[in-house]
Amino acid sequence: MSILSFLLGEKKKTASVAKERLQIILAHERTASGAPADYLPALQRELVAVISKYVKIGNDDIKVNLERQDNLEVLEVKIEIPQA
């Protein structure tokens, strides 16, 4: 790595920055409209997959819930881990 590239740093391409910003705006618009969070089942499956690498759990041992009140969103994740 040259000193010049170190000082100036690697810049992200404007297209990728614009894409990231658009994704954030779209996600915000979806949640502001009161539409149900369609990512919750996928989040629950991924959590089961990750946690089951370390502890034996089933799909029913994890509950994921999203609550909206005024301008506040609360993502609640309940994980029941069996006694060892």
From Swiss-Prot:
It comes from Ralstonia pickettii (strain 12J). The gene is minE. The keyword Cell cycle applies. Keywords: Cell cycle, Cell division. Gene3D superfamilies: Cell division topological specificity factor MinE. Belongs to the MinE family. This is Cell division topological specificity factor. Prevents the cell division inhibition by proteins MinC and MinD at internal division sites while permitting inhibition at polar sites. This ensures cell division at the proper site by restricting the formation of a division septum at the midpoint of the long axis of the cell. One of its GO terms (biological process) is cell division.
